[in-house]
Amino acid sequence: MAPVPELTSEMMAYYSDENDLFFEADGPEKMKGSLQNLSHSFLGDEGIQLQISHQPDNKSLRHAVSVIVAMEKLKKISFACSQPLQDEDLKSLFCCIFEEEPIICDTWDDGFVCDAAIQSQDYTFRDISQKSLVLSGSYELRALHLNGQNMNQQVVFRMSFVHGEENSKKIPVVLCIKKNNLYLSCVMKDGKPTLQLEMLDPKVYPKKKMEKRFVFNKTEIKGNVEFESSQFPNWYISTSQAEEMPVFLGNTKGGQDITDFIMESAS
């Protein structure tokens, strides 16, 4: 067995004579105060039986103190015990031993956030004038009326729920054209917020914390939905009253521009 090193002056600053009672050659033989004669005892008249093994082990002082603190707290708890304790009974004691503390995180680490499962659903959208959204060319959405013969032209969006400024009315989401993996995003062009489509790597996206330009705050209004840009508040995904016009980002509600959409499941 390797010799025990001498205590340095720095280590002595954390040394207490009481530590000698915990670590002896053949295990603890005596303890001061309320821990005396606990080799075989009960916590109260009817409680948890405590047995201390005198077999030497390699548990650290931290382990010993953790056990002692827990036992001291349990000794102060009074509860009825008309039958032997079961696992469920012991679980209820954890809240008496441990104190729950909130974890405050001011910033997100994408390395951890991306491990969380992304909830996604497939939908089609029509504006309240019954115009469907179709892909025109490679990177442009247009709104037009479709009939039974060409209904298959409407795009299917995968809507994913992500982190954002969520409240009781607004839900942060991203919208991706499922077939082409094109994401709706909001950028500033020529001094004006603009809606565009961006192709992203499906191995990376969607992720729980998306770049803000991709995030829309979804709000339900009388059975319909609207999508407000997170990057540009008070700017919404909009369509024109005219036929086959591009879908755009607008800041007018209740006027000529249409911001309310009918959402139908495509899953």
Swiss-Prot record:
Primary residence: cytoplasm
SMART domains, A to Z: IL1
Residue numbers covered by the propeptide annotation in the UniProt entry: 1-115
Annotated site residue numbers, Important for interaction with integrin: 170, 178, 189, 203
Keywords: Cytokine, Cytoplasm, Inflammatory response, Lysosome, Mitogen, Pyrogen, Secreted
Pfam families (UniProt xref): IL1, IL1_propep
GO biological process, one term: positive regulation of immature T cell proliferation in thymus
Subcellular location: Cytoplasm, Cytosol; Secreted; Lysosome; Secreted, Extracellular exosome
GO molecular function, one term: cytokine activity
GO cellular component: cytosol; extracellular space; lysosome
Source superkingdom: Eukaryota
Protein's job: Potent pro-inflammatory cytokine. Initially discovered as the major endogenous pyrogen, induces prostaglandin synthesis, neutrophil influx and activation, T-cell activation and cytokine production, B-cell activation and antibody production, and fibroblast proliferation and collagen production. Promotes Th17 differentiation of T-cells. Synergizes with IL12/interleukin-12 to induce IFNG synthesis from T-helper 1 (Th1) cells. Plays a role in angiogenesis by inducing VEGF production synergistically with TNF and IL6.
Subunit structure: Monomer. In its precursor form, weakly interacts with full-length MEFV; the mature cytokine does not interact at all. Interacts with integrins ITGAV:ITGBV and ITGA5:ITGB1; integrin-binding is required for IL1B signaling. Interacts with cargo receptor TMED10; the interaction is direct and is required for the secretion of IL1B mature form. Interacts with HSP90AB1; the interaction facilitates cargo translocation into the ERGIC. Interacts with HSP90B1; the interaction facilitates cargo translocation into the ERGIC.
Comment field (misc): IL1B production occurs in 2 steps, each being controlled by different stimuli. First, inflammatory signals, such as LPS, stimulate the synthesis and promote the accumulation of cytosolic stores of pro-IL1B (priming). Then additional signals are required for inflammasome assembly, leading to CASP1 activation, pro-IL1B processing and eventually secretion of the active cytokine. IL1B processing and secretion are temporarily associated.
PANTHER family tied to this protein: INTERLEUKIN-1 BETA (PTHR10078:SF30), INTERLEUKIN-1 FAMILY MEMBER (PTHR10078)
Family to which this protein belongs: Belongs to the IL-1 family.
Protein name (record): Interleukin-1 beta
Species whose genome carries this gene: Felis catus
Name of the gene: IL1B
